[in-house]
Structure formats: structure tokens, C-alpha cells
Amino acid sequence: MNLFLTGIPKRIFASFLCLVQVLFFTVSPFGTPSALAAGKGVNVIIMIGDGLGWEAARAAATAKTGKWYTSGKGEGLAMQTLTGYTYATTYGTTVGGATGGTALTGTNAITGKSPVIPGFQFNPAFNAGTPVRKAEATASVACRNGAGTTSNGGNIVGYEPSKGGPNPWTPLSPAVAAAQGFNPEYIKCSYPDSANTATTLYTGVKSYNNATGVDLYEQNSETILETANKLGKSTGLVTSVPITHATPGAATSHVNRRSKYDSDYPVLDSILQQAIRKDLPDPYSPDRKDIKPFMPTVLLGGGHPLDFQNATNQTTTQPSGDGYVYIKPSTYNQLKYNPSNPYGYTFLERDGNVTYTNDLSKIKDGGAELLKTAAKLDPNKGDRLLGLYGARGQNGNLPIATANGDYSSTGLDNFAVYSSAGSSAATTNGTQIPKPDTVRPLANGIDNGRGETAAQFIAKERKANPTLAQMTQAALTMLNKDKDGFWLMVEGGDIDWGIHDNNIDNIIGNTIAFDNAVKTTIDWVAKNGGWDKNVLIVTADHDHYITLNDTFPRLLAANGAESLTYTQHTPATAGHFFGSEPTLKYGWGSHTNRMVPVYYQGKKLNLAKYIGKTVDYVDAVPGGKSTKYQLPGVANAVDQSHIYKAMLEALKA
């Protein structure tokens, strides 16, 4: 692939860089220039199921095969066929009693422009907070955390297996946690988010909730995507949710708040502008003159602005003014209408004709178009591909498959709004009735006034949008043309949305859709160099508090996931619950600090050497001295920073 505007031939540039060791966390030598020139570069692929903890994976595996397991890797999913298995800690930092704050004052909203909090001195002690039992069925924070309410004032959340459990399946249920010596409230304390965990996976740096590609002081941390660029490798990001969400965003931006999705040109303090601007660094930037090009070779995912607000009777192929949440109108219009825009991407998008016709033959097949385009483009010629998709009414996400694959949730809002505890008006230990969205944004004026049925809506949205597996295949097809190798991240982001909404139907469907993409990748590896040439890691960014009872397989088989979601309102009849209260179906609606599964394979991946090892943390005070600390590891587990190190080594092998 061409390296931006340098004019330097790729292999010469890559060979030069391979002589220089520039990263702090380097633990193995660079690959030799001759190996790269011979096309022997390793392909490193990480696939992240957002929120895909051990229990969510078990739910999907059980739904798919009917088999039940109570410990270990399990079976039934493609990811569980990978030979390597461990689990990872996911914790981040905490300042002043909050996990979402930096060590800066926040007086200037621009990333890194605020001064350090007066008197702040980093303390490497663990500080998860003090667990407090809450029986109420809410997703309120269950812990008093931070320096204001604990004695040590530490700035690392940490993970203590003596409190949370030595692995993701111990304790198997909060109902037995106390009897086994664990605290069922502990994993609620100071839980991480997708931004800081992705930052750790891509940079090796632990940071605060909201951070994308920056450290505790909002300083830039080089991402593995940037490193791959320097090595002359192609790069890709694929997601089932908006392309400017935290998991893809942390690989392609240095931003202090994950909600900075996009900005109008030439402002650069946003995820999308940093990701796709090619004319960087920009000496005329009003805010971020420090940003260099990220420019992923392939960027595919959701966030299309068509009808974000779930409004009814949408009758135009053009997005409404309220729809531009994940991408600005100026950016969208440049990509769509201006071939000489400042971004340099071949641009594909979902078909908007769905609001004009019910004739399925007139709807562009988004998956087929994407695969055909990817086959034509060549990163060695400087080609780049950006595909923007998302179903109407779903906050920019791809169509939701549901557990039985009927896509009956497509077009319905599904993120911590309707069936979660916070919206169910539950009383302590009382029966909770979910309130799911039932109104799709149907185009009521089309087809001579007959409008659009739910079945027509679903069929058209499915055709207009590729699946995650198709996007993964397209990315692999295009990136594989770079014989120097590539780095690729694929995210099943909507798994997290289903769990936030306490919706077992969507959890299972989204996980299986993600696993289909994993199978696509495994099959591709077998035909393209095998495990000598390719490395695959499948993991989660963080966990959620979901528990499956022993009755779950029987109840799922008898009733189906849709019934367990919408008509069975107690743990006894639904076979599962959310949170630390076994008698409440909806006792929580957010993440936990529990360890997450890691499935992996590839001869160039030496992740096993990090199992049980300490965790490096560098306190890099702006303009001052950097101090390196070693934090305690967990027996039989790795940390997400170790996954970064192992990927980096494989990338340079």
C-alpha cells in the first residue's frame, strides 16, 4: 500500500523502519526487510465481541448446539475451535473517585489542552471501590469508589481474584458467591468501558473510561494500526455498529472523549476526521496540529445517517437533519459527492431506495456490491475502501439477526432503553415487565399509499446491508493483496447493545452473527497461508453481569429465546438474570470488571508466555519523568496489555 503523501516506495520505507526500534513495549526484534520483501509478512487479526463475556458465549453456544458446559472454553462456536484459550483482565484507571476522568482539569475541552490537576500524583495501588449491596432493580453504580471514599486513593482499578473469582466461571452464580468466599458486588465496581479497553488492546496503555488512543494525561499513545502503517502493512476496521464508536475509534484516533464522533472540516479533535483525513499533519488545524494520518485501508461498518431517530413515515432517500449523529453532513456529502475530497476513499453506502419502493429487485444488494468492489481494489495502488451501512431505526447498527435468525428485531431500538431494568419500573423483588420498542420507521406513503409492512421492511433492510461476515470477507479479500501482511480488527459491537438491554434474544442472535464472521475468518485462513502466515485472536473488550441458571438449556429449548426475553419475567421461568440478585431478572444493565475469554491461534502468536505475568504501567507525566510500575497479574490469565504485546510481536515477525 502507498504510505500517504511521502512519495517513498512502500517496501523501501518498511525496510528502513524495520531497522529502528521505536516502541516502548517492544519485546522482540522487528522482522527482517528481506522477509517483508518476500511477501512473508504475518497477518494479524483480532476479533472483538463487544461485551462478549463467558456467559454470553455460553448462551450462544447452547442455543446453537443444545450442549451445556459449566467451566472452561466450552464448545459449539467457531471461536471455541481455536487451539489457544485463556482469559484476560480488563481494568483501567480511576481518578478522584471516577473511572471516566483524566488527570487533567478539563478546563479545555480539546484533547490534551487542559493542565494537570493541581497536586495530582499517580498512585499505582489498586482501587476498585467499596462494594455496597443494592437489592433494587436498577443499573445504578453499586460501589463507592475512588480516593474520596477509600483509604488508599489508588489510581488503578485492578482486579482481585479473591473477590471477583479466579476465572470467568467462578463463582458460577452470584447465588453461591458469598458461600465460596467471593463478593458478588465486587465486579460491579469501577467497571471499564469499550473505549479504555480498546485503547489497552491497541496500545498496551491502561487509561480511563472514554479514552480513545490517549493515556491518563490525554497524551497520544501510538496504536497498533499506526505501527502497522509504519511497517508498510495494510490495515482494516470492520464493525456491526457505527464506525465512529469506541472500539474502532480507539484504533484510529487520539481523543479524550469517545462521544466526539465527527467534526466539520478542518477541526480534527474527533474520531472520524482523524481516522480518514489524508492531509495530515495539518499546520492550519484550529485544534490538533499533532495528528498524523491513520487512514485505515478498509473501514466498514454502521453509522449511516438514514433515519437515525426512528421517525415514522420516512419518504426520502436522503438522511434527515437529525440523522447525522455518527457522521457530520459535511463529511458525508464530501464522501458521497466529491471525488477530490480530503479523504481519498472509494465510498459505498446502503441503498436509500428502501423508502421509495417495496420492489425488492430494485434494492441494491449491499453485501454483493461490497464483495465485488473489494475484489477490484488494490491497496498496493493506494486504493482505500469506506463502507457506511446500518438499518433504519437501529441507531446505525446492522440488521439484528435474533436467536432464530428471523431478524425480527430489525428496525427496533435496542440499546438500554426498553427492556432494561432502568425502564421497567420495577420494585424490589417484584415482577418486572419489559417495555420493548414495537414501532419501526415504516415508509407509510409508498406503494400507492399501501405503505410498508414489517416483513417488507425487514427484507429490504437485510438486502441493503451486508452482514458482518460479508464485511469481514470483503476486508480479508482486499487486505490480502498486500503481501507485506496486514492488521485487521473485526467487532461484533451489537452484542453489547443486546446485553445492555437485557435481551437474551438479541444477545444470542448477535453473538452467532459475530461467530459467523469468525468462521469466515477461520475458513479464509485455511486457504491463505494457514496458521504459519496468520494470527487470530477472538476476545471481548469487557464483560456484563449476566448469569445463566442450570435450567436455561431446558427452558430455551422449550420456549425459545424470544419468549425468554419478552414473556418470561422471572429468573425461574426465564432461566437467566442480570446482576447480583438471583431473584431479579433485571437487576443490572451494564458492564462488569470480570475477566473475559480469549481464544487464539497462530504460530507467530506467543500469547501463552504472558499468562500469569505482571502488567506494565508507565506513568508518563507531561513534561516530566516517566515512571514504570509492575502491577500484579492473575494466575492462569493475561491482561489486555499482554494481548497488545503479543499482536505487536506477531506483526513484526
Give names to the regions the model predicted.
Residues 1-9:
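N-terminal secretory signal peptides that target proteins for export/translocation
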Residues 229:
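Anion (oxyanion) recognition and catalysis
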Residues 17-25, 29:
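Hydrophobic core
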Residues 207-210, 214-218:
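His/Cys-centered metal/cofactor-coordination and adjacent catalytic loops
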